[in-house]
């Protein structure tokens, strides 16, 4: 489905499209991003680091991407890593090598993105182990994301642009590592080995490190088609998510502007990716969680194990109040509903349409969401029940080919969100995507 060339006749929204996760991540953003990357000129990441990830299949070959945007798989596409990211350069180089080809020639790295060092990962593990002993673990990926954003916020981090002048980088590196070793009582760390690696990165990457703000805005002025790829998802946002069980970056639409340096009026279309049920990895409130056979059914049939960590994901029913809250923040124009096929075989499907205060019976106000753990404990879900379907829907190519009960479920979600569901994922492969042809875009 090609937004950029307006194959949907009643969509003419411009050249800049953002694909954002609308839940706790793992919504299946990779498929729609991959589909649209083929038609874009530039694909961008604006936030996070190697804590995100998806597996993409192109020409029967699978690629596991954690830092690079999906556009790297297409020779006509330029890939950009924005200033809002934290980049573990060793992981980036390994990923570049795994993709192969002349990828470096079409990759641009922001000079303002921060470098994530191995010591950040060590600190992440130290902090998480301490929290585990205290019973307060967050459930991080231990990829060093939080500690790197911490050094950024503390104004002692090192930006990629520094790597262009290696002598300057070496001095800043020594000061940072010595400070962190002292602060966290780390007695052994091979600085010389890491510095040698970074000298090689300096040689290979110095011409790829640019002022991405200027680069992006010049390309926008030239009407290039830009696809912006969100990492993680809205409910993991550092400000708007279920704090403190969140990631360390801005995962919502505001992060697009601060993480790439583009003007908010340049963004034309926001696509929210929504899984047909709900999952989350790690700790934190989950009001529709299913700790029963249905939850296990969803986990196994949906292969709900983390791309990055391989941890089993917690599973539950779709949460409409959450999506309304996320829609308010992100101004979502369209929805890609994923993994509808996983619901096939269930006798009954529940849809959370509101939350009720356990004591007062008062319903949650529209657009609000109990993101704080202590407040969420005061609420219980209000469900609408739907009959399930037994049919295998993976061969469905049109909306009208879906079982009636599946269509009722989709239309109910649209009704509550007042947002068109344009793409419907009905299987694991790229071809297993229904595109609804008739919808209204407000």
From Swiss-Prot:
Coiled coil: none
Manganese keyword on record: no
Active site: 26 (proton acceptor), 54 (proton donor)
Note on cofactor: Binds 1 Mg(2+) ion per subunit.
Cell location: Cytoplasm
Known cofactor(s): Mg(2+)
Entry GO CC: cytoplasm
Field pH dependence: Optimum pH is 6.8-7.5.
Positions of IMP binding: 26-29, 51-54, 141, 155, 232, 247, 311
EC identifiers of the protein: 6.3.4.4
Self-association state and partner proteins as the record states: Homodimer.
Record family assignment: Belongs to the adenylosuccinate synthetase family.
Name the UniProt record assigns to this protein: Adenylosuccinate synthetase
Native organism: Plasmodium falciparum
GN (gene name): Adss
């Amino acid at each position: 489905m090609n937004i950029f060339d307006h194959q949907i006749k009643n969509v003419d929204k411009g050249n800049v499209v953002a694909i954002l996760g609308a839940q706790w991540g793992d919504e299946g953003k990779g498929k729609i991003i991959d589909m649209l990357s083929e038609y874009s000129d530039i694909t961008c990441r604006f936030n996070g680091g190697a804590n995100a990830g998806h597996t993409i299949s192109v020409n029967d070959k699978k690629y596991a991407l954690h830092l690079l945007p999906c556009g790297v798989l297409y020779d006509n596409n330029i890939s950009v890593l924005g200033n809002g990211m934290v980049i573990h350069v060793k992981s980036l180089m390994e990923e570049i090598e795994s993709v192969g080809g002349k990828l470096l020639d079409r990759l641009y790295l922001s000079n303002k993105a921060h470098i994530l060092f191995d010591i950040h990962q060590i600190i992440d593990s130290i902090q998480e182990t301490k929290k585990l002993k205290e019973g307060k673990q967050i459930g991080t990926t231990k990829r060093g994301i939080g500690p790197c954003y911490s050094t950024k916020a503390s104004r002692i981090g090192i930006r990629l642009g520094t790597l262009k002048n290696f002598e300057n980088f070496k001095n800043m590196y020594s000061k940072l590592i010595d400070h962190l070793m002292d602060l966290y009582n780390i007695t052994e760390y091979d600085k010389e080995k890491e510095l040698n690696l970074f000298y090689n990165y300096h040689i290979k990457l110095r011409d790829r490190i640019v002022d991405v703000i200027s680069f992006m805005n010049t390309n926008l002025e030239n009407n290039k088609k830009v696809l912006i790829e969100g990492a993680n998802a809205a409910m993991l946002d550092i400000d708007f998510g279920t704090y403190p069980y969140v990631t360390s970056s801005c995962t919502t639409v505001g992060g697009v502007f601060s993480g790439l340096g583009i003007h908010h009026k340049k963004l034309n279309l926001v696509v929210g990716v929504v899984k047909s049920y709900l999952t989350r990895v790690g700790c934190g409130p989950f009001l529709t969680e299913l700790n029963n056979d249905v939850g296990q059914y969803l986990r196994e049939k949906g292969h709900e194990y983390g791309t990055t960590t391989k941890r089993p994901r917690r599973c539950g029913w779709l949460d409409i109040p959450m999506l309304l809250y996320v829609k308010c923040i992100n101004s979502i124009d369209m929805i890609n509903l994923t993994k509808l096929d996983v619901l096939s075989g269930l006798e009954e499907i529940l849809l959370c349409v509101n939350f009720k205060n356990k004591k007062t019976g008062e319903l949650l106000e529209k657009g609000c969401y109990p993101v704080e753990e202590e407040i969420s404990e005061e609420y219980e879900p209000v469900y609408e029940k739907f009959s399930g379907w037994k049919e295998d829907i993976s061969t469905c190519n049109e909306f009208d080919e879906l079982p009636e009960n599946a269509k009722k479920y989709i239309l109910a979600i649209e009704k509550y969100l007042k947002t068109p569901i344009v793409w419907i994922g009905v299987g694991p492969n790229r071809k297993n995507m229904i595109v609804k042809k008739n919808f209204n875009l407000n």
